[in-house]
Amino acid sequence: MKTTSNRRSFLKKIGVSGVTASVLPAAIISEEVNANPLADSRNNAFEKNRAKRDYNATYKDEFLNRVAFPIGGLGAGMFCLEGTGAISHMSIRSKPDVFNEPGLFGAISVKGVKNGAKIVEGIVPDWKRFGQPNTGNGAGGSIFGLPHFESAEFLARFPFATISLEEKDYPLQAEIKGWSPFIPTDADNSSLPSGALEYKFKNTGNQSVDCVFSFHGKNFMRPKEQDPDASKNGKNSIRPITNGFILSQAGSETRPHDQGDFAIYTDSADTVVDHCWFRGGWFDPLTMAWESIRKAETKKVDAVESGAPGASLYVPFNLKAGEEKVIKVMMTWYVPLSDIRHGGEAKEDEKCDGSSGCCATSAQMGTSIADENYTAGKYKPWYSNKFKDVTEAS
């Protein structure tokens, strides 16, 4: 009985407070909100720091939270290198996909050093850790909770973006330089479906160190939307390429535009490739990949027929005191079809003289066409008529 009475008393108080709040003048409510000293101090600190940063200067601290640098050929699709070094905005299917974080990341491990394994990125912004879907359950399957460098600075100078990373009492300084194919007056080579990340490591200690750099990726080429009948979907696989791997998705009869490949490879001849992460439940694949990073292993696993959840490449190296090492990670994609169509049925080909300024077709310009039999009537990216597949584009 006492419990019932207490509950009724609580509900009455809630009801009264709700009515009171509804009739309070807005000025009083505003005054109460603005009286929060912690909020005031944070706002003042932000305004003070914002006033200090010059236009187009280096980004650091809270200014890293929302900055992202697009990488990719003109009109060929793109991904973004964020201010912290994270890879996001993966948009390679002929349309923007700015909330697509594909699960690609670089890592470094220094042998014989306590806590020597790190994701080669700065600290994850608060809005990602607390505002993204599934973060209430710990963001399982993400790299948010893995060790990152404590300090990051970002500088954009098109077509390059440079991120400097440091950690107190850590023997290496790291730098990421991302860039797009861009050659003034060369439209074709500036429109290639590719981009690169150069990872540079410098030994700032006074002793030689043995390290393993690695780059990892979930097979994000599998479309988010597929036919409920799995037998009607194309095969999802990870294939080999020299010094790397290809994340691959085949098209199907009902969804030919699902076809796509994303190649990741390095310039290091001693690259070791794991073509198939551990296949388990929940986030076991990423957990096992992190174990290899933590132990500074170089794990070689051959490609499987289908269903590989992700892949990794490893580059071992040694740095003497003061030495530097640069490892280039190249990325090339090939998504030849789309489901995009605008306008009505095609009419008779317009007779066009390119020198007059009208838009001539590839055939009229004398350019070889990779697929002369394409008649689907949907948009095809320019590069798909120049290259037959991802290996030719790489």
Placement of each model-derived feature along the sequence:
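Secretory targeting signals
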Residues: 1-6, 32
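Residue-level recognition of alpha-helix boundary/capping or hinge positions
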Residues: 5, 11, 113, 123, ...
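N-terminal export signals
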Residues: 10-32
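Beta-strand-rich N-terminal accessory domains
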Residues: 11, 36-127
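Acidic/polar, glycine-enriched structural segments that form the non-catalytic walls/loops
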Residues: 34-53, 58-59, 162, 167-171, ...
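A short catalytic or substrate-binding loop motif that flags glycine-/basic-rich loops and adjacent residues
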Residues: 61, 70-72, 154-157, 191-193, ...
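An extended acidic
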Residues: 85, 96-169, 251-293
